[in-house]
Amino acid sequence: MLLVRGGTVVTAEASFRIDILCGDDGEIAAIGPALDIPTGCDVLDAGGLLVMPGGVDPHTRIGPDEQRIAALAPVLLAAGTTTVIECVGGPRGRGMRAAWQDWRRGWRHAVRGGGVDFSAHMVIGQYDGDVARGMAEVTQACGVNSFRLSCGGEMDDTQVMGVIDHAMELGALCALDAHGGLVAAYLRAGLDRAGIDSAEAQVLSCAAPVEGSGIARAIMMAGMLGAPVHVGPVSTRDAVDAITAARLRGQRVSAEVLPRHLVLDGEGDEVFPGCDALPPLRDGAQHAALWGGLASGMLGMSASGAGGDGGLAGEACMPDLAGRMGLLWHHGVRAGRLSAEDFVAMTSANAARAFNIYPRKGAIMVGADADLLLWDAHGAAHVLSSCYGAPVVSGAVVHVVRGGVVAYSATQACVAGGGRHVDRPCFGRDLAPRVRRRAHLAAQG
């Protein structure tokens, strides 16, 4: 058992001074002021620190390479993240359930000493009867409740709507990106012919209106079916406006933003790690809209999008993985844009709610997983010199508890322990008719 005592507990709703007792089963056993120390219980002093739920990263693309997974898991822990939801695909012709089994086997082996919990979005690149059957299998047997796909890419609108509709009937959520598509592909081809490539071509072919219209179209298709939808990453005012309009109509829309799009400027033609990733970096005028979307709750969560653009020693990298917490704290909380409670909502609670693992994750209450981030709110501002753009961060991860065990510490030796797969149950069977009724009411308004 582990008693975390003397800190200020911060949840998405409130802050208060209480102790937290973590049980041997990896769950929170008790909370309250001045808890007694059980016999044989270890004590972790949280004096002067904020105690928050461990971070939930709702969008990573780390991939299946076991060496890379094993190397990045400790980086995630050191950044305050205890749970990731990884995008999982497979070669065409490989069944969805088989692809999930391959992925789970590799990740379970790779993180056995890394301590980060993991779950999956299944990536869909085409839609037919086999895919529909695979969707049913993974939702029923594999703890999957979300599917990630591109709107406007290889799949036409009929296929995209087919996926959304089928997912809805299964009690699953579709997560859509809408940054590429035929418009962006057409523009990119013309830029390639003109000899314009790399970062400049990405920005020009996926301009703000392209992203905004794509996000609006994805939301519209889900709305016509009465389905909830998750969109992102979001990087422009146009996209924020589309999300805001839909939510004000009563549509169930959640959205994510990458920290890079909050602080890094995409002006110029410098080639940088991840410059071919979508969405591209934007000019500084877009930052205010994204911060406004976060502060108002229209953009509910931050994600790292961590994938092939670095994160390991010796690699050039974007700051989203190592700096997800510090960037939001420095430019959000310290700058007065966000509260500490907002910070918790955006780094853990809202993602856990959106993907149906709350309150197991993203909460501090009896019965929740004992995943805790002990944060020094007064940690000095410093530059992430190893990351592109050398952004400034502040605050500091002092300890990370996962499953009731100190998995990372900046001040003492610890053993991370093995990470676990997190089953995400599908939403209730009554969700589809309720949301469809709500969508019809929104459409009438």
Enumerate the predicted regions with their spans.
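N-terminal metal-binding scaffold of metallo-dependent hydrolase/deaminase domains
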Residues: 1-38
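Histidine-centered divalent metal-coordination motifs
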Residues: 49, 59-63, 177, 233, ...
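Alpha-helical scaffold segments that flank or form the walls of functional sites
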Residues: 49-50, 65-120, 125-145, 161-169, ...
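Histidine/acidic residue-rich metal-binding segments in metalloenzymes
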Residues: 130-302
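His/Asp/Glu-enriched, well-ordered alpha-helical/loop segment
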Residues: 196-226, 271, 292-301, 305-377
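C-terminal cap of metal-dependent C-N hydrolases
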Residues: 366-423
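Intein/HINT protein-splicing elements and their conserved insertion hotspots or analogous self-processing inserts
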Residues: 410-445
